[in-house]
Amino acid sequence: MVKRAKCIIVLSGGPDSAVVAYWAKNKGYDVYGLTFNYGQISIKEVGCARKIAAKLSIPIKIIDLSSLKDIFAGVTSLVDENIQMTTDFSQPIIVPFRNAIFLSVAVAYAISINSKYIFYGAQGSDAQHYPDCRKEFYNSFEQTARLGTNEELEIEAPFSNVPKSETIKLGTKLGVPFHLTWSCYLNLPKHCGKCESCINRKNAFNQSGLTDPTESVE
């Protein structure tokens, strides 16, 4: 039997990373999930990541970085309830260097299980807003990881050039359980429907011509 290549998926609980996980499984990778509690208000996304991993029958590690809330307090509305949540893209929703923090842990995990591949869910519309979703960033981070480990690691965002709507279409074909995914920045029973991430999700489903199986307050 040919041994399958292992890969680490940074699985946030959102639709983009869920599609990456299903894509990797479909490609024949032996998939390992990795998700984070970084002190975010929307802690529900961690539970969603766990459910997606269960659907895929893959292992998942939940890393407690909740003390990062002490660093991000006063900086981002994703961890600080005293900062107003915006409905459009603006500085308060940025968590500084978040992907780099997550990818650093993913590199350590990859080395520990002899995995060469790390994938995360940055997609086409992210790059214009988030520096740590850009190809230049993760290519550079890949080189740093190689220098720091002496291993030929590969870090990739497979859909970094693909609009979110097209990612959702692919996910539907792959059988992604979008009803289990979470996008909202708040920790409510349903998506709030008003935060930037909810609006982004709503627009992507509308553009894809597909129906979002989750419910929103608005």
Question: Model-derived features: where do they sit?
Answer:
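ATP-dependent adenylation/nucleotidyltransferase module used to activate substrates
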Residues: M1-G175
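Charged, low-complexity, helix-prone segments enriched in Lys/Glu/Asp/Gln
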Residues: R98-N99, R201-F205
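Local cysteine-cluster metal-coordination motifs and their immediate loop/turn environment
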Residues: S104, L180-N203
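Glycine-rich nucleotide phosphate-binding loop and flanking beta-alpha elements
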Residues: D126, F205-N206
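Short amphipathic alpha-helical interaction/hinge segments
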Residues: T149, N206-G209
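Short cysteine/histidine-rich metal-coordination sites, predominantly Zn2+-binding motifs
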Residues: N187-L188, G209-E218
